[in-house]
UniProtKB/Swiss-Prot annotation:
Organism: Lactococcus lactis subsp. lactis (strain IL1403)
Positions of the UniProt region annotated as Repeat 2: 84-148
Gene expressing this chain: clpB
CDD domains in UniProt: AAA, RecA-like_ClpB_Hsp104-like
UniProt name for this protein: Chaperone protein ClpB
Entry similarity comment: Belongs to the ClpA/ClpB family.
């Protein structure tokens, strides 16, 4: 017996049998040791016996009992499991003879299984024979398994039933009702049928963007084959989806992958055109299994494709087809392209209506038609980096899953009642230990409350259970209806007209009637604790969660917040009414849903001197909309003064450092599509920057360096500039009004600095007025209030007299510099002296500091606050 002349699987089995013998302290390897390895789950031997009708659990128990009967030998110099027992040796001898007779080069597992029948007195043989498995039956099964092939490699077992092992029968899946219906796509399915019917080049490859339904087209073809809705040449054919991952996985030795693939191709070849092979992600065959000195899958397929021995359908994306398939011209020309375009919103709604029932059965929910329409329209508008129908199906699935999770969770009312009950029970336990009258009185009150709450709790729980049961009944009935419809389809395909008639005119209408009655009852009962409907509202919530864009219906609090947005912004930005109104209107338009869907929410150019609130307004808007001023994309345009730095906005071009990192502007918006973009000091940027912004301002789109389209339609663009600020400073009226002449001077300077095509695309150019003395006083109040808040944390109160505020305003006011000198002056005359007093221990906690003006100087009066 030469172990080198055994297949790899057989060698591994013998090694494992030896380990069992060593662990059990058995001197030799017996027949049950080896057979214990053969019947392990999913092994070759287990599948062989299972296919021949042997009860594996029963047979495994017998093998275990036989192993237990073998005597263990103990001792110091004894070697375990080094030799074969006479019975096992006889099996190998017989197997050698059978292998030679069959012309095999290696001894494989199935020959050993066959040789067992030579041990007629062995309990394992007796069991097989008594259960109807004879040597002749086993031999016939082996011949069928091999299909006339001889064992010429050490991986022979890997190549048996290769298609079953490395592929999925799509036609069988359709027959068993495991596939979702395919709606529409008739034209593409007809194209595939036409290509498959050709004499040469009869291998279609479906090319389209990810998520447009390429795989679904092949599933649709499988469904047509089952319904016999195909030409004669395709009737009774089978489509096998090849799993390239399973084919490559575990191929340890050189040539093993090629052997597996050749075995698959041989099975397809032997079927004489009855099997159509489907490879999803077709580009993976280029280079698959390629190691030094071996061929890749693409080269193995070429000869069969050229001779027309293989019917193959492929599916891949446009990018991957270009990258992998078009580089191998010999492989590419053997395929016929079928382009799969993205369906329209109307087609997507039809697809969703076809899938609706499947989702309802899976999740146990009711999906309203308005939810399907919303899923198609909202995904098309807001989820721009993916394709229909995939993204719309995802929304429906996600919304249904959300409702399903809520249905199984405790309702809010019941949860609150439980928490309150627990709280009272804890209080009751604590009061039981007290002996005073007040505690006893309180205990009585609590016990009364607990009794009431328990009653309420039990009622709510009973109501919840009843509602859940009602929803469960609907779900069960839907499942029953689905099963009956599948039975009807099977009966029609098999030509069993009697059964089909009984189902169509008897069972199905009866179930439909029962289902309608249950649904009507649920509607009239008005389920208040269990929400089982998926409506437009749930879809908008999912879209909002996925994109960060608020498109849900406005709740009352949010309406108030939006309507009072100008007043809220004025609390931070003093003066500048026109700017605040313009920005607020853009946001209100967006949330009302009436803005142009093909442009950004708003684009503004803020002009004015330094320190008047241009950047502050953008920050205030971000804080109001997103509760944090960090939630805005701020780009300081002074960093983009050189021509080469422009590429940082959209990403470095291929071949340059930083190509993989993406652009500062495009990446920020891609991650958070609903945002405020602040382009600060825009006049400092290189003129080429404005060329990039033209598409953003006009169409709300920008393509980054990788060719990915970034959507700017849900952003507010704010650009700030100091162009023409000198005119505003010199010529502003006494009441802060800007004259027409000044406006014209500023605009002419603006036109001289920026190109007309850039200025023409901006929604509004807003001139910020220089701050008047009254505005400065308001800003002082705001700044000192911020300082007061900081001091309150140290338990110190701050109070400024009115004359101090006026004095600071008059001394710090510089029209040319706006509010910024005010901050510096406040630090100098208030914050610095205060800091020294605190460090010196002059201002202890629980103090009040009153700031007054004494002889034109700031004076600090420190008082202790009475307890």
């Amino acid at each position: 017996m030469d172990i080198e002349k055994m297949t790899t699987t057989m060698q591994e089995a013998l090694g494992s049998a030896q380990q069992i013998a060593q662990v059990r302290h058995h001197q030799v390897i017996e027949v049950p040791h080896l057979w214990r390895i053969f019947v392990q789950p999913n092994s070759f031997g287990a599948n062989f016996y299972k296919d021949l009708g042997i009860d594996l659990d029963d047979y495994t128990n017998l093998i275990e009992k036989e192993i237990d009967k073998i005597n263990s030998v103990e001792g110091s110099n004894i070697t375990y499991g080094q030799n074969l027992s006479p019975d096992l040796f006889q099996i190998f001898t017989e197997a050698d003879k059978i292998a030679q007779k069959m012309g095999d080069e290696y001894l494989s597992t199935e020959i050993i299984l066959l040789a067992l029948f030579e041990l007629k007195q062995n309990p394992l043989t007796s069991y097989l024979v008594s259960h109807g498995l004879t040597k002749a039956k086993a031999q016939a099964a082996i011949e069928k398994l091999r299909g006339g092939d001889k064992v010429t490699s050490q991986n022979a077992e890997e190549t048996y039933k290769a298609l079953e092992k490395y592929g999925v029968d799509l036609v069988a899946q359709v027959k068993s009702g495991k596939q979702d219906p395919v709606i529409g796509r008739d034209e593409e399915i007809r194209d595939v049928i036409r290509v498959l019917s050709r004499k040469t080049k009869n291998n279609p490859v479906l090319i389209g963007e990810p998520g447009v339904g390429k795989t679904a087209i092949v599933e649709g073809l499988a469904q047509r084959i089952v319904r016999k809705d195909v030409p004669e040449n395709l009737k009774d054919k089978t489509i096998f989806s090849l799993d390239m991952g399973a084919l490559i996985a575990g191929a340890k030795y050189r040539g093993e992958f090629e052997e597996r693939l050749k075995a698959v191709l041989n099975e397809v070849k032997k079927s004489d055109g009855q099997i159509i092979l489907f490879i999803d992600e077709l580009h993976t065959i280029v280079g698959a299994g390629k190691t030094e000195g071996s061929m890749d899958a693409g080269n193995l397929l070429k000869p069969m494709l050229a001779r027309g021995e293989l019917h193959l359908i492929g599916a891949t994306t446009l990018d991957e087809y270009r990258k992998y398939m078009e580089t191998d011209k010999a492989l590419e020309r053997r395929f016929q392209k079928v382009l799969v375009t993205e369906p329209t919103v109307e087609d997507t709604i039809s697809i969703l209506r076809g899938l609706k029932e499947r989702f309802e059965i899976h999740h146990g929910v009711t999906i309203h038609d308005n939810a399907l329409v919303a899923a198609a329209t909202l995904s098309n508008r807001y989820i721009t980096d993916r394709f229909l129908p995939d993204k719309a199906i995802d929304l429906v699935d996600e919304a249904s899953a959300t409702i399903r999770v809520e249905m199984n969770s405790l309702p809010t009312e019941l949860d609150q009642a439980n928490r309150r009950l627990m709280q009272l029970e804890i209080e009751e336990a604590a009061l039981k230990k007290e002996r005073d009258d007040a505690s006893k009185k309180r205990l009585e009150i609590i016990r009364g409350e607990i009794a009431e709450l328990r009653e309420e709790n039990n009622q709510l729980k009973a109501q919840w259970e009843a509602e859940k049961k009602e929803v469960g009944n609907i779900s069960e009935k839907r499942n029953e209806l689905e099963h009956a419809r599948h039975e009807l389809e099977e009966a029609q395909n098999e030509g069993n007209l009697e059964k089909a008639a009984a189902l169509r005119y008897g069972k199905i209408p009866e179930i439909e009637k029962e289902l309608k009655a249950i649904e009507e009852k649920a509607k009239s009962d008005d389920l208040s604790l269990v929400q089982e409907s998926v409506t437009e509202e749930q879809i908008t919530e999912v879209v909002g969660r996925m994109t960060g864009i608020p498109i849900t219906k406005l709740v009352e609090g949010e309406r108030e917040k939006l309507l009072h947005l100008p007043e809220t912004l004025h609390q931070r930005v003093v003066g500048q009414d026109e700017a605040v109104e313009a920005v607020s209107d853009a946001i209100i338009r967006a949330r009302a849903g009436i803005q142009d869907p093909n442009r950004p929410l708003g684009s503004f150019l803020f002009l004015g001197p330094t320190g008047v609130g241009k950047t502050e307004l953008a920050k205030a808007l971000a804080e109001n909309l997103f509760d944090s001023e960090e939630h805005m994309v701020r780009i300081d345009m002074s960093e983009y003064m050189e021509k080469h730095s422009v590429s940082r906005l959209v990403g470095a071009p291929p071949g340059y450092v930083g190509y993989d990192e993406g652009g500062q502007l495009t990446e920020a918006v891609r991650r958070n599509p609903y945002t405020i973009i602040l382009l600060d000091e825009i006049e400092k940027a290189h003129p080429d920057v404005f060329n990039i912004l033209l598409q953003v301002l006009d169409d709300g789109r920008l393509t980054d360096s990788k060719g990915v389209l970034v959507d700017f339609k849900n952003t507010v663009l704010i650009m700030t500039s100091n162009v023409g600020s000198q005119y505003l400073l010199d010529n502003v009226g006494e009441n802060g009004e800007i004259s027409e002449e000044t406006t014209e001077n500023v605009m002419s300077q603006l036109r001289a600095h920026f190109k007309p095509e850039f200025l023409n695309r901006i929604d509004d150019t807003i001139l910020f007025k220089p701050l008047a003395l009254e505005d400065i006083k308001n800003i002082i109040v705001k700044m000192t209030s911020q300082l007061s808040h900081r001091l309150e944390e140290m338990d110190v109160q701050l109070e400024l007299s009115e004359e101090v505020k006026v004095w600071i305003a008059e001394n710090a006011y510089e029209p040319a510099y706006g509010a910024r000198p005010l901050k510096r002056y406040l630090t100098k005359v208030i914050e610095n002296p205060l800091a020294k007093l605190i460090i010196g221990g002059k201002i202890p906690p629980k103090s009040k500091v009153i700031v007054t003006l004494v002889e034109n100087k700031i004076d600090f009066d420190i008082q202790t606050i009475a307890e």
